[in-house]
Amino acid sequence: MNDDSQDKIIHDIRIQLRKAATELSRWKLYGSSKWAAEALAGLAEAIDVDQTHSLADESPLRNKQGVPKQMFEIPQNGFGLSETEYDLYLLGSTLFDAKEFDRCVFFLKDVTNPYLKFLKLYSKFLSWDKKSQESMENILTTGKFTDEMYRANKDGDGSGNEDINQSGHQRANLKMVSNEHESQSNISSILKEINTFLESYEIKIDDDEADLGLALLYYLRGVILKQEKNISKAMSSFLKSLSCYSFNWSCWLELMDCLQKVDDALLLNNYLYQNFQFKFSENLGSQRTIEFNIMIKFFKLKVFEELNGQLEDYFEDLEFLLQVFPNFTFLKAYNATISYNNLDYVTAESRFDDIVKQDPYRLNDLETYSNILYVMQKNSKLAYLAQFVSQIDRFRPETCCIIANYYSARQEHEKSIMYFRRALTLDKKTTNAWTLMGHEFVELSNSHAAIECYRRAVDICPRDFKAWFGLGQAYALLDMHLYSLYYFQKACTLKPWDRRIWQVLGECYSKTGNKVEAIKCYKRSIKASQTVDQNTSIYYRLAQLYEELEDLQECKKFMMKCVDVEELLEGIVTDETVKARLWLAIFEIKAGNYQLAYDYAMGVSSGTSQEIEEARMLARECRRHM
């Protein structure tokens, strides 16, 4: 076979392999696509074909009718990839799809195109993340590292057999692989490489030429900076990325994770509407303007959901998005979650029912649906949901959380904890799983384990109200009320209009001896109450505190409010109203108001036998003086 014939065959094979790698990946046959890309990378070089010319310099003859129809052209994607770079992209992309991240990094080690550089460094980051997650799986299972694991990490062999003979050449090879592996696992080296590349690349281009490749690198830099707790620089990188390319929803979510309190969100919102600008290269038409860019509107809604803002500030954006996206399941799930956060469980359940009918195989947000069914004690419906999602995908974090809620509803807390651990093994950032697992440990009276779970939750998401609230409750169970007070205060900054948090803050202040602050908290709780029946116990507690402060007139006022609530609720009696009637009867007897005292005593128709007997005794005493 002469050289011309061989080159022609190689050229045809190259075209066919490119076509196979691209089309098989498009139709999700990742194994076959990876094989074709590997074969393409291992193909011999064609002598008469210049493989380094740019796509912009493609010969117009490619579009002539004489070219066979089966000829596969490299897509004119505007990424500026040469033929060699495109072949590398196919190989790296298929290896990435097959989750062979280290191999992807190896084959892309010398790339200079920003898109390929992102693919390489993103693979490197995911490889590091995968290894760190695998090390955490052991903690979730056993709670500690064993000596065998330490030896395996140290010596590379967990079997304990230290008599394996290796040649010097083998040791050298192992050392080389180990050093390269260690370098790939070092997150700081990834950040350094990104910074070096961005510094050199930004010099070469004008500000308006920033493209998607640059946006992706800024995004990855932000993710790594956030991982290293450098929040301010991470936010700066995310904003640069969004300025170049605004439709990266993951970048918006990462930016939101940088917000720890409501004030941060307000400052960011002001910055977005006053100083932020979109670049023209990747943002089209109306989406270049802050006013009409839908991603900013989605971001504002997500921030409202996470930081429990006032609905009036976001209602206009929500109405606009619902008009533009009337069938977007994400928005419907958002609406349902808002109802859940506002404790409107009936509306939330109805909205989730509609979502399940519209998109029955969507598992996102269904763990919130299971929380609603759990709180409403609809155990049969929760059991059906758990069975349904397990048939769709048993190995999704959402599925594990739903099954865990089902076992918790059946009081099988050990099984519930097991499924929450599975959810965390599948996705270690599932904050909800950490928080709910903490609740399960509280049910088992294991406060120390609960505290550890809640701490993990707030480490991942400092905006998690339930985790801060859970920490306060766990320390309250241990009678460590100053610690409890601190964590309840943190929770209060996230939900200042929640009645429950002011009530527990009042209890904490009361137990630490600060009665004045306790009274203030209880009064704030009353203002935040939505219905009258929620206030009975608070009125009685306020009356007790005023009695301890020897302010009997204020005490009497709140005792009377307790009784008034009973009348407003059409005679529904609580323990507090019974005690309030007895206290008022004694108070009026001391004041000489026997008729009024008699009425209070006769109003005690239920309660403990001791309370009923005391009421009869007071009534008899009143009759003797009347």
Swiss-Prot record:
Phosphoserine modifications at: S59
A GO term from the CC aspect: kinetochore
GO biological process: anaphase-promoting complex-dependent catabolic process; cell division; positive regulation of mitotic metaphase/anaphase transition; protein ubiquitination; regulation of meiotic cell cycle; regulation of mitotic cell cycle
Pathways involved: Protein modification; protein ubiquitination
Function field: Component of the anaphase promoting complex/cyclosome (APC/C), a cell cycle-regulated E3 ubiquitin-protein ligase complex that controls progression through mitosis and the G1 phase of the cell cycle. The APC/C is thought to confer substrate specificity and, in the presence of ubiquitin-conjugating E2 enzymes, it catalyzes the formation of protein-ubiquitin conjugates that are subsequently degraded by the 26S proteasome.
Subunit structure: The APC/C is composed of at least 13 subunits that stay tightly associated throughout the cell cycle: APC1, APC2, APC4, APC5, APC9, APC11, CDC16, CDC23, CDC26, CDC27, DOC1, MND2 and SWM1. CDC23 interacts directly with SWM1 and binds the destruction box (D-box) of the substrate cyclin CLB2.
Protein name (database record): Anaphase-promoting complex subunit CDC23
